[in-house]
UniProtKB/Swiss-Prot annotation:
Gene3D superfamilies: 2.40.50.40, High mobility group box domain, Homeodomain-like, P-loop containing nucleotide triphosphate hydrolases, Tandem AAA-ATPase domain, Zinc/RING finger domain, C3HC4 (zinc finger). Residues 494-594, 631-673 form the Chromo domain. This is Chromodomain-helicase-DNA-binding protein 3. Residues 23-133, 231-359, 431-452, 523-542, 587-611, 692-721, 1349-1399, 1513-1707 are annotated as: Disordered. There is a cross-link at K721, K1971 (Glycyl lysine isopeptide (Lys-Gly) (interchain with G-Cter in SUMO1)). GO terms for molecular function: ATP binding; ATP hydrolysis activity; ATP-dependent chromatin remodeler activity; chromatin binding; DNA binding; helicase activity; histone binding; RNA binding. ATP binds at D761, E762, M763, G764, L765, G766, K767, T768. Residues 1530-1550, 1622-1631 have a biased composition (Low complexity). Residues 748-932 form the Helicase ATP-binding domain. Residues 1566-1966 are annotated as: Required for interaction with PCNT. It comes from Homo sapiens. The modification Phosphothreonine is found at T376, T1646.
Length: 2000
């Protein structure tokens, strides 16, 4: 061991923790550990505080005081330093250096530690010594047996340390005393070891010394655990004394002032004060990594103070071992790597199965025998399996675990701090123990000039520097004025900060309920000046500040125990909870007090006056958000008795689930607590009989008990009717209606007869009450004691509970619902009084057979019947009640099957609609009731299918008679208010029509399948159409496009306009609100309810809502709020299914059924919520039905279904009648479609159409008039009442004539079914849509396109797109031209004789626009997507594809003009047509504009270099011009199969196209039309032919001058740039006046990242190396392509084909992308490779990129195959030649071209943006974050360059240089981390360049019209905006001047733009097509005019 090592002990007793450190050589013989050695901690959260004794002595030499290296400098404050070290060093060093490190649990008890120190004994040095008991005494005291063992000499040799001794002795002691507790075992072992060491004959040896030390350690631990609670001194006995330490160390310190320091303020980074701290350690501290702590049995290793090992080399001790641990340079690490940055969790290898403290011994130095032991505070066996082995240690408690014993088990030790599952559960946070130790080590360097100070450099409160007061127990520092209350002066003596003195919380906080400002603390008076004038009054004490206090609920305690906790306590003990609360709540203003009683203030004030207890509770609890119910006892569910005989009760609180039940003491002062205890014991006695444990005061006399319980034998005959209601009912205070009494009699009679029954009264007649009274009567009359099982929908369970309380007060009713935990508690405590009647735990187990059931009634939901069937199925039930029993209508449902397996004596089913759909369901109900009688479904159905109606009814009546009772409200309540149902027909809104048509078109195939569509798909279509009738926002697409508010809710206006129903609802609700009615709104779709919520919020109505997701308690609360007198809620939103069950909302008198259910019964269920007992007003029911839609048809079918199936007697109704036949579905779907598609044809005058329903105020008033009796639809009225007449008493069948009438009408409709209906209606829409889809598929996997509901289903809208734009804005530029004007259909018809075709015309069912039919419009769009905008002379060029050839120039130009105008029309893409009524045909502005823009950039780039690079990529392949002239001047491209379509045209433009190739798809990369495929095959078949045909140069007129002579070739023209600026990264690229020569082709022309070996795996995705960012900014001279000019070795490389062409053509090409893409990096590498290998053609580089772009200009976007087949671009094929024999060669090649083009496209877009930024003079404000980043980068660069030499010098061994290098590296690291932080913040601060329209302050349209006249040219406005991408005549010279005025805002300073900068560079993602904003046309179209000479040196601004 090194001299510096200390032995540290941990001892735990029950109440205290103690940590002792003392020099290893020193044993208790010398002296007692004084108060600084032993610190007592009250509480289990032990804070470890250590004090250093002197260093360990070498061998047996007497201990000297520590030797310091540099004494002189320290002498003056030596004593203070020692003192400080004693007091606070360990406390202060437990933290990381970082100021932010929070001190977790350590702070807590420092205060107590200090105050509880023991007072010094008599005198300074002499301490009272206490006898240590011998092992024999201890054993005697504890009554244990001693071990007889005589130690041999060998024992003394082998048992050299405590560990070995303990392993030897422990089993012996355990054998004698098998049940000995661990603590006693340890104490005895310690005593034994002490005696063993004392008797050791070999004492003098080194081994003995070490052994003695370990013994002392163990002894102290043991003595402490035994005796420390009494805190009496302990006397040592034992090994020989070592010399005591020098007196100086023991002297009491002089009084001193508390420690202060000068802080450096928040920004300052701390540096270690010690120059000798090795680098590795610094790194560790910087990262705040705790050291790796592995405990491995007996590995040789050296124990450092910090609790880690550093394994030591065998060479022997280091020379400086005594001086300092730190100097050895070893860092805490078990693995031996000094600088491992990340540590793994500490592991410990225990001895198998032994439980003991672990003392590790190890030889200190090779060759020496000395062994020292140390003890860790962790157990060395696994907590779970109690075995040893390799275990990991918890950082927050002494437990240890195997990795595999954890749950979930771990594969490897976790890194960093780790807390065990126990601590996690108890909420203990880790203690930074290792850091503490780590820093102690650092602090202990002997030669340090000044003490290591770990206190924070800034004040913990204000985060500022200055003179700070440092805590003696932790690293916190404070200004004295920041404390609360502020201190007037620095205090004397030791000072502890508020965190260290913060009291511990009384438990774990469950949640924070409220906060408030507390009282400010009392001020500290200023001390009197000693020399001051006594007359001068003392300064006024500084006032404290108020601090926040939090009202908290504790885990495991009830709300009665809630109390206030200080903010500091929460911050320390519950940091995460505190932070979350802070984040979610306003921490400046306390939350408003919530008068939890929920009543308005007036009522609660009155109540407070009357009830002082309530006032007190309000004051103390209720106003902080605690509901009174939560503090009200619901019932006591169990009791327990502690050792002292005190009773504790498990209390279930009202309105809280069972898992929040809490144990309360007997004496708790809770209202009604006594009564509940009384009833608990009384019920227990009833069930269990006499209980000896029962407290005497609760014991009842036998007689009293009998009154409570049921009679032991039946008191009357259940078959005898009650004429008046029985006494036990009257006692409850309730009165039954006569019909309910009849029901009760009938139920009792059936019970007596053993007949299971269905109670089928109509809704609202009180089936629940009749059932409860029936069960209660059975109990009270002694027929049965239960238990009864009631299964009901979750929503009605609360209602059942209430009714049971009311009508059956003596029943013990348990509600079995809730989560797993709640149900586990119910099973354990509520199923039986016997303790282990049922196994505990979350899984449900069977109940023991003989166990007595504790409850009378168990209420549960359907789901739990199936989920917990193990527990529930094991009980024998006297009666089962199923509420809403139509859940059993399907015998396949799990509920049916599970319930069938329960043991049940009697069954009662309740349902308001017994015969919902058909006989089959009725049969299943009967089958469930009496399976032995009803078990043949087929027989049953047949029997009732073929007899006449009368017989059927009679027979069914006889069959059902005994089992079913049904009464109607109409029969029972003659005076109940009437109800009127109206069907309200509503129009579809335009948006709904669009979606409706789309759905039909999209599903054309399903509708039209000859075998009749599959039923499921038809139902799906129907569902979609129903959604559409409700609201288009139910489709995700529409919802995405819809306008929203910042809160995420839909914007009200648009929401209402989009749906016909909402428009009507808006008007109705306003009127209803005025008239004071209240409304229930039912919808089947919960999403629709969401929309209705947004609608009601927008309209400002208060509402409640219930749907399937809102469960029992919340439901009932909502209902109660709505029904409360004077409630503000105006509407109640319900989902039809969830809201139809047992809910009473009789306070509302208007029901709106927003969408009808398929099943009319569900709707009846729904409106019966309002029309029920308790309703005082007439009920109006409005059923919204969309006119001419599936809804209207469904309503008709449903009416029929009501009539027929309600009778349960219609022939042929068998099983299938309930579900709709395909025929019916088809009929429903057809309904109204013809009219819908016809609608558009009438054009604009639809509003006047008489069939359109328009609701004005008058109509609404009529609709809401409650006096109308006649329903427009009398039959509906009658239907609904219809067999609400299945009375068992009398069957009445009314209105049979009407029934037949309706049937007939429908059957007639069914007869004349047109088999081709869908074919005629939808075929062409469908085909059109398929074309659209194919076009939009693009390449690769189709991105699911937004559902384009507007396209497809209209004849006149052949191919509309999901990206439609519609706008009412007039187009000012085109108004004067008739073809541009918006014209009515009539005008158009009259203009047919005019030369231009009309704007819109219908020809043979197809719409034509300006004479262009669908196919031609599609062809035109395809051409645009292929070549960009048509050039000026497009009509005379090959741009005009085959489909458009028939058009005159005028028509063509007019259409181009119209197309452009539509492109620029602002507005959402959602509308069906453009502003002028032209259908939007799949036109996505964004895509088209993007494509036009990209093609424009490509064309311009190619034109820029075309005159230098010529037209042929390999001029040697150029065909002989003489041969060429014989061919037609309009050569077809090689893709044409025959060369013979010579439609000559006078002038060819550079963007020639091949007329014969079909148009590509929009993103035509992947899909080719069949024609293309054919061509492609032909191309492969006939390569020779193609090469023969050759390819003529595009325009002979413009053919490049013959290749220059050799001399000329070597010197391409160099034209100087106007503004050459050396670019700083991030500065503006100068804009040359002449782009052709604008830059040298970046450094060199760049090489093939793919040689021939791999032409495909591009490096496009490499990130740009840092140094190269500037390489484009540094504008190199424009030298053409010098590096590319071949040396002599390349010269004759012309593939041997044309020897005569020896000179290389000139070549020049560049894209100035500012380094924002990786293009230039690629080019550099590729060119390097190409030049060095001489394979200029075979390695892809800059030259190939140019020709790729040229090919795209000629052949169109992504026509890779055409380009490869064109001889002009032969160079593109060169790099792939070596791959040609591979299987996937073509695909590989095309993929590479596509990827490469994406990169070029990206670079072009960025270049364009840079140009715009320059043009706009955009510059960045210096204060902007982007500039800070820029400055930091420059700083880093400068720093790096200026210190390059250091690394060489440092390596050469120059130590100062080494130190400086480290400093520089640290600075660099800081700079880089700052830059990293800046970069992460950047995106938020960046904004985009405003759209061009905003920058020019012009609308898109006016920009477009300006563009029509390019520059200053005088020619008149042409009939369409000229193709802005055609080259202006002067292109290539300086650009034409910008038109005056067009650029008004051009000079706008960047500072006027929206804040934020514009740098978003795609440097590391794959190249993506940079999406343009809507400005694309504007901005790119205006390229010609958007230019001017740039300013130099400005910041690059990019709009990505």
């Amino acid at each position: 061991m090194k001299a510096a090592d200390t032995v540290i002990l941990w001892a735990r007793s029950k109440n205290d923790q103690l940590r002792i450190s003392f020099p290893p050589g020193l044993c208790w013989g010398d002296r007692m550990p004084d108060k600084d050695d032993i610190r007592l901690l009250p509480s289990a959260l032990g804070v470890k505080k250590r004090k250093r004794g002197p260093k360990k002595q070498k061998e047996n030499k007497p201990g000297k005081p520590r030797k310091r290296k540099k004494r002189d400098s320290e002498e003056e404050f030596g004593s203070e330093r020692d003192e400080y070290r004693e007091k606070s060093e360990s406390g202060g060093s437990e933290y990381g250096t970082g100021p932010g490190r929070k001190r977790r649990r350590k702070h807590r008890e420092k205060k107590e530690k200090k105050t509880k120190r023991r007072k010094k004994g008599e005198g300074d040095g002499g301490q009272k010594q206490v006898e240590q008991k011998s092992s024999a005494t201890l054993l005697l005291t504890w009554g244990l047996e001693d071990v007889e063992h005589v130690f041999s000499e060998e024992d003394y040799h082998t048992l050299t340390n405590y560990k070995a001794f303990s392993q030897f002795m422990r089993p012996l002691i355990a054998k004698k005393n098998p049940k000995i507790p661990m603590s006693k075992m340890m104490t005895i072992l310690g005593a034994k070891w002490r005696e063993f060491s004392a008797n050791n004959p070999f004492k003098g040896s080194a081994a003995a010394v070490a052994a003695a030390a370990a013994a002392a350690a163990a002894a102290v631990a043991e003595q402490v655990s035994a005796a420390v609670s009494s805190a009496t001194p302990i006397a040592p006995s034992g090994p020989p004394a070592l010399p005591p330490p020098p007196a100086a160390d023991i002297q009491p310190p002089p009084i001193r002032r508390a420690k202060t320091k000068e802080g450096k303020g928040p920004g300052h980074k701390r540096r270690s004060k010690s120059p000798r701290v090795p680098d590795g350690r610094k790194k560790l501290r910087g990262k705040k990594m705790a050291p790796l702590k592995i405990k491995l049995g007996l590995l040789g290793g050296k124990r450092k103070k910090g609790g880690s090992y550093v394994f030591q080399s065998d060479e022997g001790p280091e020379p400086e071992a005594e001086e300092s641990d730190l100097d050895s340079g070893s860092v805490h690490s078990a693995s031996g790597r000094p600088d491992g940055p990340v540590r793994t969790k500490k592991l410990k290898r225990g001895r198998p199965g032994r439980k003991k403290k672990k003392v590790l011994g190890c030889p200190a130095v090779a060759g020496e025998e000395e062994v020292d032991g140390y003890e860790t505070d962790h157990q060395d066996y696994c907590e779970v399996c109690q075995q040893g082995g390799e275990i990991i240690l918890c950082d927050t408690c002494p437990r240890a675990y195997h990795l595999v014993c954890l749950d979930p088990e771990l594969d490897r030790a976790p890194e960093g701090k780790w807390s065990c599952p126990h601590c996690e559960k108890e909420g203990v946070q880790w203690e930074a123990k290792e850091e503490e130790e780590e820093y102690e080590e650092e602090g202990e360097e002997e030669g340090e000039k000044e003490e290591e100070d770990d206190h924070m450099e800034y004040c913990r409160v204000c985060k500022d520097g200055g003179e700070l007061l440092c805590c003696d127990a932790c690293i916190s520092s404070y200004h004295i004025h920041c404390l609360n209350p502020p201190l007037p002066d620095i205090p004397n003596g030791e000072w502890l900060c508020p965190r260290c003195t913060c009291p511990v919380l009384k438990g774990r906080v469950q949640k924070i309920l409220h906060w408030r400002w507390g009282e400010p603390p009392v001020a500290v008076p200023a001390p009197q000046q000693a020399d001051g004038n006594p007359d001068v009054p003392p300064p006024r004490p500084l006032q404290g500040r108020s601090e926040r206090e939090f009202f908290v609920k504790w885990v495991g305690l009830s709300y009665w125990h809630c109390s206030w906790a200080k903010e500091l306590q929460l911050e320390i003990f519950h940091l995460v909870m505190y932070r979350n609360y802070q984040r979610k709540n306003d921490m400046d203003e306390p939350p408003p007090l919530d008068y939890g009683s929920g009543e308005d203030d007036g009522k609660s004030d009155k109540r407070k006056v009357k009830d002082p207890h309530y006032a007190e509770m309000e004051e103390k609890y209720y106003r902080f958000g605690i509901k009174p119910e939560w503090m009200t006892v619901h019932r006591i569910i169990n009791h327990s008795v502690d050792k002292k005989g005190n009773y504790h009760y498990l209390v279930k609180w009202r309105d809280l689930p069972y898992d929040q039940s809490t144990w309360e003491e007997d004496e708790m002062n809770i209202p009604e607590y006594e009564e509940h205890k009384q009833s608990y014991w009384r019920h227990r006695e009833l069930i269990m009989g006499e209980d000896p444990a029962q407290p005497r005061k609760y014991k009842k006399k036998k007689k009293e008990l009998q009154g409570d319980g049921p009679p032991s034998s039946p008191t009357n005959d259940p078959t005898v009717k009650y004429e008046t209601q029985p006494r036990f009912i009257t006692a409850t205070g309730g009165t039954l209606h006569m019909y309910q009494l009849e029901g009760l009699n009938w139920l009792r009679f059936s019970w007596a007869q053993g007949t299971d029954t269905i109670l089928a009264d109509e809704m609202g007649l009180g089936k629940t009450i009749q059932t409860i009274v029936f069960l209660y009567s059975l109990y009270k009359e002694g027929h049965t004691k239960g238990p009864f099982l009631v299964s009901a929908p979750l929503s009605t369970i609360i209602n059942w509970e209430r009714e049971f309380q009311m009508w059956a007060p003596k029943f013990y009713v348990v509600t079995y619902t809730g989560d797993k935990d709640s149900r586990a508690i119910i099973r354990e405590n509520e199923f039986s009084f016997e303790d282990n009647a049922i196994k505990g735990g979350k899984k449900a187990f069977k109940m023991k057979r003989e166990a007595q059931v504790k409850f009378h009634v168990l209420l549960t939901s359907y789901e739990l019947i199936t989920i917990d069937q193990a527990a529930l199925g094991s009980i024998r039930w006297a009666c089962l009640v199923v509420d809403e029993a139509h859940r059993l209508k399907n015998n396949q449902s799990k509920f049916f099957r599970v319930l069938n397996g329960y043991k049940i004596d009697h069954k009662l089913l309740l349902t308001g609609t017994p015969l919902q759909n058909n006989l089959e369901e009725l049969f299943h109900l009967l089958n469930f009731l009496t399976p032995e009688r009803f078990n043949n479904l087929e027989g049953f159905l047949e029997e009732f299918a073929d007899i006449s109606k009368e017989d059927q009814i009679k027979k069914l009546h006889d069959l059902l008679g005994p089992h079913m009772l049904r009464r109607l409200k109409a029969d029972v309540f003659k005076n109940m208010p009437a109800k009127t149902e109206l069907i309200v027909r509503v129009e579809l809104s335009p948006m709904q029509k669009k979606y409706y048509k789309y759905i039909l078109t999209r599903n054309f195939e399903a509708l039209n399948s000859r075998g009749g569509g599959n039923q499921v798909s038809l139902l799906n279509i129907m569902m979609d159409l129903k959604k559409c009738c409700n609201h288009p926002y139910l489709f995700p697409v529409a919802a995405m496009e819809s306008p929203k508010l910042p809160s995420g809710a839909y914007e009200g206006g648009a929401l209402i306009k989009s749906s016909g129903k909402l428009m009507l609802l808006q008007k109705m609700l306003r009127k209803l609100k005025e008239q004071g009615h209240r409304v229930l709104i039912f919808s089947q779709m919960t999403k629709m309810l969401d929309l209705l919520e947004d609608f009601l919020d927008y309209e400002g109505y208060k509402y409640e809502r219930i749907d399937g997701g809102i469960t029992g308690a919340l439901r009932q609360e909502a209902i109660d709020r709505f029904n409360a007198p004077g409630a503000q809620q105006f509407c109640f939103l319900l989902s039809t299914r969830a809201g139809g069950l047992g809910i009473n909302l009789a306070t509302a008198d208007t029901v709106i059924i927003f969408d009808s259910d398929w099943n009319p019964h569900n709707d009846i269920q729904a409106f019966s919520r309002a029309h029920r007992i308790g309703q005082a007003n007439k009920v109006m029911i409005y059923r919204f039905v969309t006119r001419a839609s599936v809804e209207e048809r469904i309503t008709q079918v449903a009416k029929r279904k009501m009539m027929l199936t309600h009778l349960v007697v219609r022939p042929g109704l068998g099983s299938k009648a309930g579900s709709m036949s395909k025929q019916e579905l088809d009929d429903i779907l057809k309904f109204g479609t013809e009219e819908l598609f016809k609608d558009e044809n009438e054009g604009e005058n639809k509003e006047e159409d008489s069939s359109v329903i328009h609701y004005d105020n008058e109509a609404i008033a009529r609709l809401l008039d409650r006096n109308q009796d006649a329903t427009e639809d009398t039959d509906v009225q009658n239907m609904n009442e219809y067999l609400s007449s299945f009375k068992v008493a009398q069957y009445v069948v009314r209105e049979e004539d009407k029934i037949e009438e309706i049937e007939r009408e429908i059957i007639k409709q069914e007869e004349n079914v047109d088999p081709d209906y869908w074919e005629k209606l939808l075929r062409h829409h469908y085909e059109q849509q398929q074309e659209d889809l194919a076009r939009n598929l693009g390449k690769g996997k189709r991105v699911r396109k937004q559902v384009n509901y507007n396209d497809a289903a209209q004849e006149d809208q052949d191919n509309q797109s999901e990206y439609s734009v519609g706008s009412e804005e007039e187009d000012e530029d085109f108004d004067e031209r008739p073809e541009g004007r918006r014209q009515s259909k009539r005008q158009l018809r009259n203009e047919k004789d005019k030369p231009l075709p009309p704007l819109l015309a219908r020809v043979g069912g197809n719409i034509e626009v300006l004479g262009f039919n669908t196919r031609q419009r599609k062809a035109f769009l395809n051409a645009v997507m292929r070549w960009g905008m048509p050039p000026q002379d497009a009509f005379t060029t090959q741009w005009l594809v085959r489909d458009l050839r028939g058009k005159t120039e005028k028509e063509f130009k007019a259409y181009v003009s119209l197309f452009m105008r539509h492109l620029c029309e602002p507005g959402a893409d959602g509308s069906e047509t453009f502003a002028d009524g032209v259908p939007r045909e799949g036109l996505s502005r964004q895509q088209v504009l993007t494509r036009i823009g990209v093609m424009s950039l490509v064309k311009k780039k190619v034109q820029e270099f075309e005159h230098i690079n010529g037209r042929w990529s390999m001029p040697e392949l150029m065909p002989d011009p003489s041969a060429d002239s014989k061919r037609s001047s309009r050569a077809s491209s090689p893709t044409k199969t025959s060369p013979t379509t010579p439609e000559a045209s006078a002038t060819n433009s550079p963007c020639t196209s091949k007329p014969a190739t079909p148009a590509p798809s929009e993103k035509g990369e992947g899909i080719r039309t069949p024609l293309e495929k054919e061509e492609a095959e032909n191309q492969e078949e006939k390569p020779e032919k193609n090469s023969r045909i050759g390819e003529k140069m595009e325009t002979e007129a413009d053919a490049p001058s013959p290749a220059p002579s050799l001399g000329e070739r070597l010197e391409p023209r160099k034209i100087p740039l106007e503004d050459e600026v050396p670019g700083v990264p991030g500065e503006m690229e100068p804009e040359p006046g002449y782009r052709g020569d604008r830059e040298k082709s970046a450094t060199e022309s760049t090489p093939g990242e793919r040689g021939e070996e791999k032409p495909l795996d591009g490096q496009e995705h490499r990130e740009r190396p840092e140094g190269e960012t500037g390489d484009l900014g540094k504008r190199e001279d424009v030298k053409g392509d010098r590096e590319l000019r071949p040396g002599p070795r390349d010269e004759p490389r012309s593939n041997g084909r044309r020897e005569e062409k020896t000179e290389k053509p000139r070549f020049m090409f560049n894209i100035a992308d500012g380094g924002f893409t990786e293009l230039h990096t690629l080019w550099q590498n590729e060119e390097r490779a190409a030049i060095s290998s001489g394979k200029l053609n075979e390695i892809w580089h800059r030259r190939h990129d140019y020709w790729l772009l040229a090919g795209i200009v000629l052949h169109g976007y992504a026509r890779w195959q055409d380009i490869q087949n064109d001889a002009q671009f032969a160079i593109i094929n060169e790099p792939f030649k070596t791959e040609a024999n591979k299987g996937n060669f073509l695909e590989m090649k095309n993929k590479f071209l596509a990827r490469r083009f994406k990169l070029l496209e990206q670079a072009l877009v960025i270049e364009e943006q840079l140009r715009r930024a320059a043009y706009l003079n955009l510059s960045q404000e210096p204060a902007h974050p982007a500039m800070a980043l820029h400055a930091r980068f420059a700083e880093a660069e400068c720093l790096a360059e200026s210190h390059q030499h250091l690394s060489k010098e440092s390596l050469a061994g120059n130590k100062p240089a080494n130190a400086v290098l480290h400093k520089v590296l640290n600075q660099l690291e800081e700079l880089l981390s700052d830059m990293k932080a800046d970069v992460t913040r950047l995106p938020a601060t960046l904004s985009r360049i405003p759209p061009i329209a905003a920058r020019l302050q012009m609308s898109e349209r006016s920009i477009l019209s300006r563009l029509a006249s390019k520059g200053t040219e005088p020619h008149p406005t042409p009939a369409y905006p000229p193709g802005p991408y055609a080259t202006p005549p002067g292109y290539g010279a300086a650009f034409s001047a910008a038109p005056v005025g067009a650029l008004a805002a051009a000079g706008a300073n960047y500072s006027q733009m929206p804040a934020g900068s514009f740098i978003t560079a795609a440097t590391n993602g794959p190249p993506v097509l940079v999406k343009k904003e809507k400005e694309m046309v504007g901005a790119l179209v205006s390229d010609g005019l958007d230019r001017k000479e740039p300013r130099a040196g400005e910041v690059i601004c990019i709009d990505d």
